[in-house]
């Protein structure tokens, strides 16, 4: 299941293999690891389908995937990483900011507690090695995207051209 040429490898990235920033999120330790991530992604799509388009969901997932591995590269000493768990944490954090009522804050609280508890774990629920830093960086990226998209939405609603660009400014 693991494609060595896809894994986040600090040494390989230092040698110019920058595709690993994205590809590492699509390589997994095992089929159960892949299936678990795929199930979480499917659940996230079902949860967010009323508040986000499929393009937004995929776009945020991909941004969180790259943001997670960039965070690992720049903000940790982790040498090797595979899996989409970090990107999924980011997608769910971003999605929580869009969910109505208590659902969003509740999801974000549970996600944050889980990521905090992960920081002291070395094995996943599958008994495979865990890189909790990935969950942390994914969560951070998702929260950053939630803040940015929230600002852009509120800018558009107030008439400020933050979301609509220069064209909206010239129309005012």
Give, region by region, the residue ranges found by the protein language model.
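A detector for small-residue-rich transmembrane helices and their helix-helix packing motifs
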Residues: 1-162, 171-172
